Amino acid sequence: MKYLKRTVLFLPLFFLLLNKASAQRKLDYTKLVDPFIGTGGHGHTYPGAAMPFGMVQLSPDTRLEGWDGCSGYYATDSLVYGFSHTHLSGTGIADYCDVLFMPTTGKPQLNQNDYRSHFQKKNEAASPGYYSTLLDKYQITAELTATLRVGMHRYSFPKTSEANIIIDLQHRDPVLDSWVEVVNDREIRGFRRSSSWAKDQSVYFYAKFSKAFKTYSLASDNQIKDGEKKLQGKNIKMFVQFDNPGEVIAKVGISSVSAEGALKNLDAEVPDFDFKKVMKQAKDTWQKELSKIQVEGGAPVLPPLPQQNNMGYGFGGNRPQPRTKTVDYAHIKQTIFYTALYHCMLAPNIYNDVDGQYRGLDQQVHKAEGFNYYTVFSLWDTYRAEHPLLLLIDKKRTLDFIKSFMAMNEQGGLLPIWPLASNETYCMTGNHSIPVIVDAYAKGLRGFDAEKAFKMMKDAVNRNQFGLDSYRKNGLVLAEDEKESVSKTLEYAYDDWCIAQMAKILKKDQDYAEYIQRAQNWKNVYNNQTGFVQTRTNGGWLSSFKPSDVDDNFTEGNAWQFSFSVPQDVNGLIKIMGGKENLENKLDALFSASSAMTGKSLPDITGTIGQYVHGNEPSHHITYLYNFTDDPYKTQYYLSMIMNTLYKATPDGLAGNEDCGQMSAWYVMNALGFYNISPGQNNFQIGIPIFDKATINLENGKKFVVASSGNATNSYYLQGMQLNGKPYDKLFLSYENITDGGYWDVFIGKLPNKLYMADLEKPVAAITDYPIVVNPYLVSPSKTFTKPITIAAASAQDSVKLYYTLDGSTPNLQSKLYSNPITISNTTTIKIIAAKNSMTSKVVSGTFSKIKEDVKAGVAVQTGQHNPSKKIQYK
């Protein structure tokens, strides 16, 4: 009887918990996505309809030019030119916006300034796979949805005998060639070949309309050509006109291969004109993808505050106004999170047709056998977080990415750097398809030819372009040989480290030895006299150094950000800096320095905290370097600051360019509480999870659950951790910790728990095999002189000997031993090496030229006196 009573008592609680769990499973994550986030500021995203990783991005075009018009849309614009079928998400260079459709009424206009329309933000709506707006000029409601390869328009016209759809093939990018053809009174097809960032991009399209058009006209150079069914040229437009149609649906398939391919895509993916069905399919697909990570909670709901006396606020005062509405910060956080996850899935983009055909980097048609071929890889950005995230939740697609890389290599002769459509743009530095491949292989992904991929990686870094020849010869890229020399040295060293990891797995000992040594070349641009990476030229350091200078020796940044770009050898960086305390002090200085940049002005440098630049990717790992110091709580402090201040649920809610998923992937990973600072190695650094609970639904059927207590009090300092019910005492998680499934419980408090943090095992990112001898450097007041000058030599490395020549010959261990500064009176080339334990550095060379008295002296190599005992102090 007692047992029965207990059962009855617990039944309501059981059903309550069951209903709560069921509700969580049924939660519509698409409602937590706001596609307008990132369309303002410098986010450069678009709000239109797209499928996850789809070929079509059907979105409104409101801006024709300018840096903040890269995606074709900007949040504050009030004019719309139409709806085109391809868009880039968050890039810093404009392209795409192909095949524009624009519904109008009245006499058809072909000039874009005549057919454009005002629209109002209050009439816009967007959700994953859907967009709508009202065109004020025509009172037409335009709705958009999409499948992978088809864009679907639904236009609701007012009553009119002149309901038009303009098709503009000249829109946006310079056109190399185009044509359009009327197939019948319900179908048209066409082609557009354009040149912009992608120098030679082809888009074919095939469009079908739900109703027959009563008439049409084709135009070349804005001149109507009566009676023509097909026109070809560089400025081709047309319109179709309906008589009081009410609603017209246009479905448009696209292809890089042919109009026939576009038709195949269209018929396969959208066989009818059921707009609602396609919209639901898009929503369901997005729901499935977004459900791969389920988050709950995150912050308390703050109730309204009582009305306060307004005294003291004044006009334009900066005091906060009384809160009159309930603020659900958890919902805001979840909106930021799921919009970020959504952005992570807008690129890369599938590029093959339904039959597998695609246009390759050689501009020839190929067929993807057994995989889908993708394009739009912003690899300098996305190797850092986007690809590690997708490797966790989408291994199948990651395998397709790698097979796409290898196909690109076969067709274009190089692993991709920044591939766009059927073009390699060669944008940015390094070759960061390499870490994507290596990270996947190191974490167990198979299904591709690893030996062939390894050869491709070696070929990519042994070319005689992009400064790689200078890098191999000198152990660094010299400024006189290549722009962005410091950044390229650091990027190449990291890529070499990745190749070394692959060689180690494949048991290629000779390759491992070579590339693990090359991975240490970052040391050759680190100046121990200043504590920063610096430009090397003519045997020494470039003079007039300012760490805040943005110049041509760095890629979209300066020495502050790039001095920490050694994720493969953080422990080596600590050693060369003189210890953990110096690293911590340097990090403190980074975050507390003035945010003012000197030198060039670059729009990419945004979202600053001191000289930390979250709006650009080289800074994205820096906060985690505190984990290697004695005060890892500072990682948690700055992560919380970044997530709470540089990500917002507003159009300007991104700190910089979205960069095809990287800016958002950083948030997703860090919101979960971990981040891989060096893809290619197995561990994720521990940060601070921001949700009460986050469940990663893995492809192997397992779940990794992150449970965080303390978020309800807006705290962000680690107090304790458990993994699968047992105390966890490391500042990192292994990949297997996550993919094997389990529970990671994190306890958070308001104050740093330094005693607890001191007991945690610190991460290691160190290169210990095959240490190199660091290049020495020359110190001279100038590289030209009129009277005898004295040139000193030095090394940042302890216990080395320097050997040099003055006759142009290559120095060796039998050359003259350097002991005192060298005085020269004639034009001389000094070549010098450092030696330690029978190993030598690369040869460092500097030429110093004697000139006549009346010739102005050249730029100095380095001014001032070398002080080998100088201690760097960071404040």
What positions do the PLM features span?
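Bacterial Sec-dependent N-terminal signal peptides
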Residues: 1-25
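Short, compositionally stereotyped local motifs that mark structural "simplifiers"
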Residues: 20, 765-873
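Accessory carbohydrate-recognition regions in carbohydrate-active enzymes
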Residues: 24-387, 391-435, 441-490, 498-524, ...
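Short proline/glycine-enriched turn/loop motifs at strand-loop junctions of beta-rich domains
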Residues: 159-161, 716, 795-800
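ATP-dependent phospho-/nucleotidyl transfer catalytic cores
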Residues: 495
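Short strand-turn-strand beta-turns centered on an Asx-Gly dipeptide
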Residues: 699, 723-726, 807-808
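Beta-strand-rich recognition domains
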Residues: 705-710
